[in-house]
Amino acid sequence: QNPRAGQLLQQLAWFAERDLQIHAQVVICPDQNDGEALQRTLQDLAQFAGGEWPAVLSVAVVPVGLTRFRPASDGLRAVNPADAKKVIAAVEPLQKEFQTRFESNFAWLSDEWYLIAGLSLPSRASYEDFPQQENGVGSIRAFLAALDEATTNLPQSVEKPVKSSWVVGRLVEAALRPVLKRLNAVEGVELTLHGLTSPYWGQDQVVTGLLTGQDLLSGLMDQDLGDQLLLPSVMLRQGDPVFLDDMTLDHLRATLPVPIRIVHGAAEIVASALGSIEKST
């Protein structure tokens, strides 16, 4: 519906003529621009890759994100596991071709595709220097690698038993189960993983950073949350203790009957689950 969509190649040529460089993103809408259209899009973008000063440095292929706030007549639908497998099957062979041409994958699939498809994420090395991490390409893989490192030398037991709840988006829950199992093998540690949906956005499969305060209340209000609730900091606006739906962290703390700890990374999650951090933050 964008009247200038057909001008993309001319616009990229304009960038190339002026030695301007971009990292591109392709948003896939099932039945609209996947399949052969996606392959053609990536080949078109690859015309501007390679050489001493490429106009297109990398491409992220991401699924369309649909919320309940969109027009009902937009003709779009959410990505399902079959769609995800189809997109992966279309892009991975092209990555091998691009490796031969550019010594780089050039085009990367965001982590959501593999999680939606129920497949293992690619190796950390395959993301090279993570050029598209801000677009969700490799961010979960990097987080899993950090969790693996943080749980490498766990103690056999903890001095004081600690029962915790850890909240994540439903989409990443299954990928975190091995880490949960390792932590719960420590005597005295009881960690429950809550993979939540988002009634606020109208999404069943959601990443952790999109969970809102209302989603947390909806999913946790009647749960046994133990001694503490671990909330990843990505749920809050940067530098501001407010969720995406404008609910404040103070309001959540006043409503849920459990101490809430904001955790800022893999090492802090593990330390909190082990009871190694005393003061709630």
Predicted regions and their residues:
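Catalytic cores of alpha/beta
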Residues: 33-47
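Hydrophobic side chains in well-ordered alpha-helices
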Residues: 8-11, 41, 176-179
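Charged helix-capping and loop-helix junction motifs
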Residues: 6, 39-40, 244-248
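Charged, low-complexity, helix/coiled-coil-prone segments
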Residues: 17-34, 161-164, 189-197
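Auxiliary Fe-S-binding modules of radical SAM enzymes
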Residues: 48-55, 60, 66-281
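Core AdoMet radical
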Residues: 1-16, 21-33, 52-64
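Aromatic/hydrophobic pocket-lining residues that form the small-molecule binding cavity
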Residues: 8, 38-41, 84-87
